[in-house]
Amino acid sequence: YKAAEGYYAKALEISERLTEKFPEDPNLQRDLSSLYNDLGDIAKAMNDYKAAEGYYAKTLEISEKLAEKYPEDPQMQRDLSASYNKLGGIAEALNDYNAAEGYYAKDLEISEKLAEKYPDDPNLQRGLSISYNKLGGIAKARNDYNAAEGDYAKALAIRERLAEKYPEDPELQRGRSISYINLGDIAKALNDYTAAEGYYAKALEISKRLAEKYPDDPNLQRDLSISYNKLGDIAEALNDYKAAEGYYAKA
């Protein structure tokens, strides 16, 4: 990360000089915003959340100006949405759930407008599902399981439509599996083990297919392990130790 940070910092110097010289060029402004975002990602990866927050705040500042100046440009609006999302992630990592919720709500507002305006754009639809998912995560962290369930269900509905429309896209299939896991976690927290088992079983079905199709993808293999583990937890909660042992062994 240190080497990457050095390269990005040098690129940032050049980008800052260019935007100072040509302040009206939106592409140069967007490049500058992107570099702040990259440096924020590096800082976050090194667990330096304060530095990350500073970089993401600079990204947001530029994104807000561009989105205001070019309200009909979906990319500028999407950049703004992503900036709120990144700051929400930092606030969440710092356990500041109020701030995180505020950022994620702004992200959702933009994502909803874009998804409504461009219903056939899978990336914008996927972005909307992620926005719901993020808010669901905050509600879950606060033990507001009803709100979490509502947000996760909205995310799942979008992901199911996308997975049906693009059956060969592994990321869209994976998103669906993650939604089932999230809903299973909520059902488990509410002690509804039958519902939880049903959700986890659906996640397992998808994870199995993906892990088989992409045996060299570590994330998909990990997803499969998580699915088995979750089903093991349910079996254990139901005192079915034989089944639990079987699931844990596969995990």
Task: Give the predicted meaning of each segment.
Residues 1-251:
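Thr-biased low-complexity repeat/linker tracts and other Thr-enriched repetitive architectures
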